[in-house]
Amino acid sequence: TTRDSIYVDFKYKQRELVLIDTAGIRRRKNIDLDIEKFSIVKALQAVELSDSVIVLIDGMEGITDQDLSLIGLVLKNERALTIAVNKLDALTEYQMENIDKQIRRKLKFVNFVDVNNVSALTKENITLVLKSAIDAADVSLKTVPTSKITKLIEDMVESDPPPYNQGRRIKLKYAHQAGSQPPMFIIYG
């Protein structure tokens, strides 16, 4: 079995894309350590080369520690993230709901990420996952004008004023975008 990454060039809705399919990272009891180390290095390289990463979770197993580690790596490398849960064709609605709850519970820190249920076997929702990954990349690269950010801050302060600090209300003056992928903002007070 090859453990190398496969690069596939294709066009989707007038966009040139490269899909990097990496070998799955498996549980320790099921692995040949040398081959697995090679696979992990290739997966890390693929994350570094990517604008957007789709983490494919096996719906029969649920989210594993390896999945959580990979998601952490994607976020640490500041890449857009989409999660796909495979085996939609083999799971009952009840099982899918339980997996969704498990994912939302274990990934509270990434509640902004799209989670899509798919079937690699029947190809169900595959284009939905691709669209989610492209949208996530587009959003992560977006820049917002300072005036819009400042207006948003003003509206937020008006509807829900900041707390007092040492008897004085915290004042938020303006904000600007400090970077993208991921978008970062600096608020001045």
What are these regions (language model features)?
Residues T1-I20, R28-V41, Q45, L49-L56, ...:
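C-terminal-of-GTPase-core extension/linker across diverse P-loop GTPases
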